[in-house]
């Protein structure tokens, strides 16, 4: 590698293969003079034996000096390698630190969010537990209320019965009281009174009282506070219930005074508010919380109802007693003579009393119409007793009763019962309050337990977080201590970077291990390159060593020769220095003793960048870049021995000589003519890809030119394809060879028919936009429109249909070596699943439309001849083809059998059989409107007449016909990251999408070959599209060619003659698009992880670049032989230095061959142009590479021949570096024909020029016609490596090259346009 570098950077090799050093030449001169003196004094015989020894000594001495020189070169290279490794390590360390900081921030945010979510989950769980507890309590309360309601109904019935009995007893008690008051009257009345008592038993309670005696009725029933005396029989039944109610273990909270009064008053009236059982008491408290007022409202309502019922009861009783007294007094006088039993039965008004009591009963019943069956039943039993018993029994009972003692006993019982009821009610109230309190405390206990658990968990989390914070604090203190120590260490700027303590032992071990691995790989690569170059040099220059050995002999041989001619001194090298104030280039002579003088002279300069401090953070990144660009500027200005012209750094071979050859070379240099951001309005747009527009083609299959809606023909008879085929078959092989060579030359010319329009794809984070410009006036944007919401990764210009395109329907007719496997179409109208049947790796994909089946094919039984089902619509479709296009029927002839048959069996082995499948809808007129948008093709466009759109209101019929032929003309194909493929017209109506389809993976590259478009997908397959029989592109039917498994992306493709080279991992696959098969595959790099990224074809060579590699590889286009390796990394490192910007770490991002130059764009914005050497690399081996004869390459699979042109060798010794570059990677190169400035004004309009170059530019060569080409470079930002950041924005590249002064504009996407004059070949 060092030997090659020495050759690369050497000024001129001179006439001999090696030049003696100055010391050896001095010694040789002195010895030569001494030998002359000896010969003059003595004779030649004296020095004949001595001279070989002296020559051997001098040769050894010269070789020692040469080895010493080589060792110094190797030492410098090793220092550069060490410097590169250190730079790479610093950059990787900074990137890793930045990534770790981002990761820590992301982890903290995720942890905080996780803690918040956990807190929310815990709170929701606590609320859920509380709600479940409440729901359980409500369910218990409902069940207790239901039980209480049932018991209250039972209790009400028993109380109602007792209430009726107590009314009777109360009436008897009133009668006895009145009789006791009247006992002091006369004896006669007492006798009559005793007789009346015998006639009217006391048990009936119907004694004749005066009408006014009803006013003496006590008011005990009218008072709500007095307990009722009717409970004297209820005591026995109610007492056990009170004992039962006291057994409840729950204790509610204390009641209110209103509740006590309500319950006491209700119980005294014998209403519904009687003694409640234990279940009722439980339900009262547990169901209703202490703060709810529902219980008070209900009790108030019941109280009001009972009070009204009570007043009505008292009124009814008074009326009833008065009526009974009057009836008894009136009837007693009339019926004294009747018998006692009969008188009692007849005079008893019980039926009337029943009616009254039934009315009373209906008004006083609190339970909505429950009949008092107990009252009726007791009344009936009373009548039965009276009717069946005799008067003697009744009299005995009445006479034996002690009315006065009985009343006092009843009063005592009533009073005692009242006290017991009050005690029981008070106990029930206390019990209910205690039960409610227990329930409330239970709920609070559960809630507090949940809160306690949450607090415990929070405590644990806080403890963990506290430990984490303590750990972080400890780390922060350690980092702060390290930072302080680092600041102290940084103050000692004299200490070199390599000696500072910055790493731990583990990091240092890892770095050393990685360094050793990189070093080992580097040494292996250097050894391989050195060995290859040595072998090539020895093979190409076999006489070099002989020249080196005979140079000293030649020097001393003059002693014995008669000629005394002195050797000519080599011309000193010319160094053109640019003087900025005068804009002139002045030659200067400078002696250079060795190759080392071209390398950096200051040995410490390799560590200039590393001696800087690295304390700049992200905020000061811009200032750091400015400083680095300043140092690049200083490095560029230090470089001597190179010519600077037109913004390029040229090698010294461009020195001015008398014959004017250098002037011609200077004249053909690229001249920068335009430099500006792509879009002044939108600064967020990023460049992605671009392509020049090819407006050629647009002809029908039979040679007709499409103009508007008409088709014109030059000579119809002469364009008969079948006749031409027959004539070509009858020609001799020599004429056939000549014709094929002419066709190849015609294809080369068609490929160069480009317009000056350029489509540029720019993207933001959400949308992709297409900007159309004219390279002649790149500042004027012709149009811009949005394509889709995904990134457009590639774009290709597809010319219109040509008569030289492969005919549709004959793709597999000539490939006899194709595997005869079964072929099946994949999507029928009833099934959406793809049926993969491979034909040499080919899958046919069809997208059927509604009403049109896409020729569904099924594998045959024998596996050799598939059955192709023809849709019945094909007969009607073919009849609609225009008569002016006869080849449309010829293209479908192979697919049709008989017109009346619907199925046809085709043998693949038969020649001429079209086995893809039937193209449906030839003219595009039967596509329904409700198609899926993925496969729907929009063929609408305007009428094309000489590339000018006609107004919509003109020629409606012609416009309708022209819409069908829209994709016959030149189109632009755009491939998006989401797998969508868009086809736009490149003639007019650019915004309108003619066709679109969604493929199964991202689209990475698109190429066109003779009417076939190949689309590379990220899953390792090629989608192959053809034109339909009408000449339009048919996106609904295509082939898929699988390059192998496992699937990897196809990164790049290029057209090489009539084949396509595909970059697939580290391999290159050569695909024959017509036969749709893989012809050849070979490794471009030994490692599988090294992917092929760019391919550039010219002549008989293809230049290949590898991912993350700075070496370009040249392969032969026909023999696939590896011809040359060119490493651009040493050149870039030499020109720009090896600073922290990483110019030494070169990766190639853009590659193009144009204007007999190899254009290389790198990942750090450097642009290199390397002139190609069309002739052979050396003339020493004329047998291997013939010069004047025409080389012809044959195809092993067919009789086709291809003319050999030239092999595009190049040498880094001739490389030219552009000082105009980008801040980021170079995205693309585009070359289109055009002329911005005239060749006469190119010297004056350029930014850097020379006097002689300017004068030579004004004299165009009359021998070779020159063609002007515009080369466009696109990338992020702009930088002038001579000016750095401070002056790069203010420099003007002529009048048409204004640069915006703001820094933000300098970082936008920029276009750089050069004009190159190249020969018309």
From Swiss-Prot:
Polar residues bias (residue ranges): 236-248, 266-285, 322-332, 855-864, 1255-1266
Keyword ATP-binding on entry: no
Highest taxon, organism lineage: Eukaryota
One Gene Ontology MF term: identical protein binding
Gene Ontology biological process: JNK cascade; lysosome localization; negative regulation of dendrite extension; negative regulation of neuron differentiation; positive regulation of cell migration; positive regulation of MAPK cascade; positive regulation of neuron differentiation; retrograde transport, endosome to Golgi
Function: The JNK-interacting protein (JIP) group of scaffold proteins selectively mediates JNK signaling by aggregating specific components of the MAPK cascade to form a functional JNK signaling module. Regulates lysosomal positioning by acting as an adapter protein which links PIP4P1-positive lysosomes to the dynein-dynactin complex. Assists PIKFYVE selective functionality in microtubule-based endosome-to-TGN trafficking.
Subunit structure: Homodimer. The homodimer interacts with ARF6, forming a heterotetramer. Homooligomer. Interacts with MAX, MAPK8, MAPK14, MAP3K3, MYC, and MAP2K4. Interacts with KNS2. Interaction with KNS2 is important in the formation of ternary complex with MAPK8. Interacts with PIP4P1. Interacts with PIKFYVE.
PANTHER family xrefs: C-JUN-AMINO-TERMINAL KINASE-INTERACTING PROTEIN 4 (PTHR13886:SF2), JNK/SAPK-ASSOCIATED PROTEIN (PTHR13886)
Family per similarity comment: Belongs to the JIP scaffold family.
Name by which UniProt lists this protein: C-Jun-amino-terminal kinase-interacting protein 4
Organism: Mus musculus
The organism's taxonomic lineage, starting at the top: Eukaryota, Metazoa, Chordata, Craniata, Vertebrata
